[in-house]
């Protein structure tokens, strides 16, 4: 993934979004539904109805960037709320994009005794 700029905030848009929206449609949703400025340099995440696709909208200072990801297996973990936003850290964003439950990360392997 492209590195996040220092101080960039990450916002997850709760609920389902029509991912047929592109740059302008998602920027409009950021303004109307989330009451945020899409040109602020913050990242805005949207999830589709099936839960296996997300789009990330981000202003990099020169123009809007739109990133998309589709999981081949599983679904992206999303809040149950149907409206509003959730703030994520960069680490939580990385986990989310890998398909990991960012709300309750767990070890997959417990360390054993060192020999």
Question: What do these predicted ranges mean?
Answer:
Residues 1-115:
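Polybasic/polar functional segments that serve as interface/processing modules
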């Amino acid at each position: 993934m492209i590195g996040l700029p220092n101080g960039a905030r990450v916002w997850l848009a709760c609920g389902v979004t029509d991912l047929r929206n592109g740059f302008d449609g998602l920027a409009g949703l950021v303004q109307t539904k989330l009451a945020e400025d899409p040109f602020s340099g913050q990242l805005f995440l949207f999830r589709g109805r099936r839960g296996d696709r997300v789009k990330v909208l981000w202003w990099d200072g020169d123009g809007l960037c739109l990133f998309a990801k589709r999981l081949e297996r599983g679904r992206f973990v999303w809040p149950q709320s149907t409206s509003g936003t959730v703030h994520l850290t960069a680490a939580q964003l990385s986990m989310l994009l890998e398909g990991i439950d960012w709300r309750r990360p767990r070890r997959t392997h417990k360390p054993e005794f060192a020999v």
